[in-house]
Amino acid sequence: MIDTKLIVAIVVGVWALLFVVMMSIQKKRKSKATDYRASNADKALLHLYGKKFSIDGRDLSLFETVSGENLEKIVALPEGSHRIAGVYQSTEVSALGQNINLESEKVEFDAELEKGHSYSVAMYAYSPEERREYYKGDVPRDVLSIPLTLVKGSEDVKAYIIVYQDNVGEGEAS
């Protein structure tokens, strides 16, 4: 019969090996994202959270992108107005502590992007004003906010697609 200590030692050994491999993969991903940001400092960096994205009518797979944290996709775009379309996803925690996965239908909008800035486009269960109040004003500047409802034409807003400009320069209002 196999000794219990041997089984525990094997499990711990496999866990340690997998831990080292996953840490190495994570470090390479972070390094790649950092290099991508540095090499595209003269463009607008767009961080997208969701799936099935297209920019200016072209599928996101046609652009050079990198994956960031939390399944974000980072794409560098030239300065100017861009048409962004996609299905946005988010996870919220209910009052009972259960995770609720939110997913929008395809949402399409135009956004004006400036070079040298980083933008996050994501779905939130709260408005930019509610977030600003909660964090006592310590939030990025919201460039665009699109309220989403469960029923078309309803006044009962359930979520927002928000474009935040993450790195507002010194002296600019946030």
How does the language model describe each region?
Residues 80-84:
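A short tyrosine-centered beta-strand micro-motif
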Residues 1-76, 87-174:
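Short loop/turn and low-complexity linker motifs enriched in small/turn-promoting residues
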